[in-house]
Amino acid sequence: PKNLHPYATSHLSGEHAVLAANDRREIQGVVFRLSNAFGAPVSKEANCWNLLVNDLCRQAAQKKTLSLRSSGKEARDFISLSQVCSMIELFVSGDFASLETGVFNLGMGSSLTVLDMARLIQQRCLYTLSRFPALHVSYETNSDDLSGLKYESSRMPSLGIYLDASKNIQELDHLLKYCSHTFGQCL
């Protein structure tokens, strides 16, 4: 089924423009499709606080609680922004001109539910900031469907690019410290 939402169609149109210009050899371009990224910004004014993990870490610092606006059963592929930057740097500095197609999914290739990510944030708060924030789930759905998401990112290892899951934990700890320091209410 096709997604006709303006967000999706505008992104797909942009992808087509990049790939067409690449095919015409006007640019050397690739398309990165980003999964659910998170990480500390350079400035607190950065437009990043609507990212799920960033929002939850900010909540932990400001409110000392985590509030989900869903059941939390949704599966997502989470990746740290530092790993995204590293992958982009590899593409910029490497020779990937011979690739058949320039579409790459940037993700870890494994899923976690939103609720499990919130629980991980609770655990990392305890470890990093010595506080365990409460977790509130806004509502439960009648569905018990916990089918896993498989965000296909297998092209990266085939190019010799490997991701390290421990970097997600490091980034999460850094984000929690950033939020605690930046938003002034140390946990």
Name each region found by the language model.
Residues 10, 49, 149:
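Short, conserved glycine- and acidic-residue-centered signature motifs
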Residues 60-64, 68-187:
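C-terminal substrate-binding subdomain of Rossmann-fold SDR/epimerase-dehydratase oxidoreductases
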Residues 4, 35-49, 70-82, 110:
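Glycine-rich "substrate-gating" loop/helix at the edge of Rossmann-like oxidoreductase active sites
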Residues 18, 56, 155-157:
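Structural element of the ATP-grasp superfamily
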Residues 2-30, 35, 58-62:
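Active-site Tyr-X1-5-Lys
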Residues 15-19, 54, 89, 115:
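Short, hydrophobic alpha-helix immediately C-terminal to the catalytic nucleophile
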Residues 27-32, 40-43, 47-55, 60-65:
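Oxidoreductase cofactor-interface core, primarily capturing Rossmann-like NAD(P)-dependent enzymes
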